[in-house]
């Protein structure tokens, strides 16, 4: 495992995030109270306009997140034993994001992350994440979420050509700590991976 590759990928992802389109940077910051954005209801518009607005608001939020990948589990029902034995399931890496909770307590984030993939090659990913959150009334500090991420990744075997990667998201959160996961669908001996990471908000 080459830690220099991970560091370089994280730096490049961070540079991309910091130099995203000026439309994101021009949106004024919104007020913050106890970790939640004080926002007016979302403006009317088509799906694309709402997506751009949500990305912009997350980008301008003062709240930050650290991402630590912890596991890539390959579905044993869709892989040969030989393949499983050859794959890496410890995706060492790190990521960074900016997030907000909207007026409905739903989570929005823009993020960049880099980790070691199944073949021990560096894989970067960056994108926008959204989750509808449920807050149990009698369990203070807990949140449960389900949603999606619209992301772009790049892999060694595809010569690091950027690839779109929309995926589902679910999470369990307690205060600032979250366990978040996605499932990457695929075919036999390809894809079908449960990817899990820890998210720490600061």
UniProtKB/Swiss-Prot annotation:
Single GO biological process annotation from the record: lipid A biosynthetic process
Keywords: Acyltransferase, Cell outer membrane, Membrane, Signal, Transferase
Active site residues of this protein: 74, 117, 118
Species the sequence originates in: Yersinia pseudotuberculosis serotype IB (strain PB1/+)
Compartment list: Cell outer membrane
Enzyme Commission code: 2.3.1.251
Site-annotated residues for Role in lipopolysaccharide recognition: 83
Quaternary structure and interacting proteins, as annotated: Homodimer.
Residues annotated as signal peptide: 1-25
Gene Ontology CC terms, in alphabetical order: cell outer membrane
The reaction(s) this protein catalyses: a lipid A + a 1,2-diacyl-sn-glycero-3-phosphocholine = a hepta-acyl lipid A + a 2-acyl-sn-glycero-3-phosphocholine; a lipid IVA + a 1,2-diacyl-sn-glycero-3-phosphocholine = a lipid IVB + a 2-acyl-sn-glycero-3-phosphocholine; a lipid IIA + a 1,2-diacyl-sn-glycero-3-phosphocholine = a lipid IIB + a 2-acyl-sn-glycero-3-phosphocholine
Entry protein name: Lipid A acyltransferase PagP
Site (Role in the phospholipid gating): 188
Function: Transfers a fatty acid residue from the sn-1 position of a phospholipid to the N-linked hydroxyfatty acid chain on the proximal unit of lipid A or its precursors.
InterPro entries: LipidA_acyl_PagP, OMP/PagP_b-brl
Family: Belongs to the lipid A palmitoyltransferase family.
Gene Ontology MF annotations: O-palmitoyltransferase activity
